[in-house]
Amino acid sequence: MDKIYAIIPVNQFANAKTRLSPFLTPEERRDLLKAMLKDITDTLKPIVDKVVIISRDEEVLAYAEELELTTIVEEEYKKSKAVNSSDDNPLNKALKQAMKWSRKKTRKVIILPSDIPLIGKTNVKLLIDQAKNFDFIIVPSKGGGTNTLIIKPLAIDMKFEGFSFNKHIEEAKRKKLVPIVHDSFYMALDVNTTEDLGEIMLHGNGTETKKYLESLGIKVESSHDHERLKVTRD
């Protein structure tokens, strides 16, 4: 059994990307997340054995089924009483649930967020090839978080939230795993701000995400202000 499953946790569409408000309306943010999710899963489908979406949102699960993805309904979150438990975070609990579901079906999992539409087949193939020889591969996000993990199911406790990159490295070392770090501009780019939208406009040729942003009349130009890119819309 030398399979690899992709696991993507997705929050509610209705609450997506609030940091992009008021630049994008709630409906536009919902459609943006749908476009990003399609880009990511279209990239993954030919490369992994199964793409799994875990969510508690019926709209997310229905959309995932439209995309012909495997879905898992997230268990109702109940805050753990244990101090510093990874289960205090609903995202970590959802990922643990998905890995429990996966562990007898696949040798490894690749865990990704739903907002990194520029990951690209080349990057993903490279990581999966590396995973044949290494049991812990991690891709940092630009803000100290974690944008991709490849591990055996339940190999470590999930430490998402805040500066999770260093937390996951520490957890790997605690479990005697050798961390392999893959730095990639495209995989580090998670979309949270208007400047991130500008990066998609510059680098997202051929993606559903860029096509959607273009349909909104979004434009980008160089800026000499405190932000590197000036992002506007018609």
From Swiss-Prot:
Is Protein biosynthesis given among the entry's keywords? Answer: no
Q: What name has this protein been given in UniProt?
A: 2-phospho-L-lactate guanylyltransferase
- GO molecular function ontology, one term from the record: GTP binding
The similarity comment for this entry is: Belongs to the CofC family.
Which EC class does it fall in?
Answer: transferase
In terms of SUPFAM superfamilies, this protein maps to: Nucleotide-diphospho-sugar transferases
Which Enzyme Commission numbers does its entry carry?
2.7.7.68
Q: Subunit structure, briefly? A: Homodimer.
Biological function? Guanylyltransferase that catalyzes the activation of (2S)-2-phospholactate (2-PL) as (2S)-lactyl-2-diphospho-5'-guanosine, via the condensation of 2-PL with GTP. It is involved in the biosynthesis of coenzyme F420, a hydride carrier cofactor.
Keywords assigned by UniProt, alphabetized: GTP-binding, Nucleotide-binding, Nucleotidyltransferase, Transferase
Q: Which gene encodes it?
A: cofC
**One Pfam entry name:** CofC
Q: What is the lineage of its organism?
A: Archaea, Methanobacteriati, Methanobacteriota, Methanomada group, Methanobacteria
Q: Which reaction does it catalyse?
A: (2S)-2-phospholactate + GTP + H(+) = (2S)-lactyl-2-diphospho-5'-guanosine + diphosphate
* A single GO BP: F420-0 metabolic process
Q: PANTHER family annotated for this entry? A: 2-PHOSPHO-L-LACTATE GUANYLYLTRANSFERASE
Q: Does the keyword Nucleotide-binding apply?
A: yes
Q: In which pathway does it act?
A: Cofactor biosynthesis; coenzyme F420 biosynthesis
